[in-house]
């Protein structure tokens, strides 16, 4: 296989992979919005438990956001520091 063709295939597949990795950012966004909405409902029901509810929500959102950040890192690596290009020879 021609080196230029192989490089084109690797770059194309890497772009598709980066796009798929960024789709993974939808999950944390939807989940965090849902959690924030439920936290607001909980505070409306029990205003005295506001501190506990908010701190638990923020901890949960931080854990959920880590998956979105990991997918962003993978997408950036595939686009700008592609490890597969060095394997072509």
Swiss-Prot record:
The keyword Membrane applies. SUPFAM superfamilies: F1F0 ATP synthase subunit C. It holds the Pfam family ATP-synt_C. It is found in: Cell inner membrane. The record marks 65 as: Reversibly protonated during proton transport. GO terms for cellular component: plasma membrane; proton-transporting ATP synthase complex; proton-transporting two-sector ATPase complex, proton-transporting domain. It is a multi-pass membrane protein. Gene3D superfamilies: lithium bound rotor ring of v- atpase (1.20.120.610). One of its GO terms (biological process) is proton motive force-driven ATP synthesis. Keywords: ATP synthesis, Cell inner membrane, Cell membrane, CF(0), Hydrogen ion transport, Ion transport, Lipid-binding, Membrane, Transmembrane, Transmembrane helix, Transport. The keyword Transport applies. It comes from the Bacteria. The chain crosses the membrane at residues 9-29, 58-78. GO terms for molecular function: identical protein binding; lipid binding; proton-transporting ATP synthase activity, rotational mechanism. CDD domains: ATP-synt_Fo_c_NaATPase. Belongs to the ATPase C chain family. F-type ATPases have 2 components, F(1) - the catalytic core - and F(0) - the membrane proton channel. F(1) has five subunits: alpha(3), beta(3), gamma(1), delta(1), epsilon(1). F(0) has three main subunits: a(1), b(2) and c(10-14). The alpha and beta chains form an alternating ring which encloses part of the gamma chain. F(1) is attached to F(0) by a central stalk formed by the gamma and epsilon chains, while a peripheral stalk is formed by the delta and b chains. F(1)F(0) ATP synthase produces ATP from ADP in the presence of a proton or sodium gradient. F-type ATPases consist of two structural domains, F(1) containing the extramembraneous catalytic core and F(0) containing the membrane proton channel, linked together by a central stalk and a peripheral stalk. During catalysis, ATP synthesis in the catalytic domain of F(1) is coupled via a rotary mechanism of the central stalk subunits to proton translocation. This is ATP synthase subunit c. It comes from Fusobacterium nucleatum subsp. nucleatum (strain ATCC 25586 / DSM 15643 / BCRC 10681 / CIP 101130 / JCM 8532 / KCTC 2640 / LMG 13131 / VPI 4355).
């Amino acid at each position: 296989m021609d080196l230029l063709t192989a490089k084109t295939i690797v770059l194309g597949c890497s772009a598709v992979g980066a796009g798929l990795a960024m789709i993974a950012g939808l999950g944390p966004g939807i989940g965090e919005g849902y959690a924030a909405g439920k936290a607001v409902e909980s505070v409306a029901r029990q205003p005295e438990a506001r501190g506990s509810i908010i701190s638990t929500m923020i901890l949960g959102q931080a854990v959920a956001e880590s998956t979105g950040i990991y997918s962003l890192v993978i997408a950036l690596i595939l686009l700008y520091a592609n490890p597969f290009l060095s394997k072509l020879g």
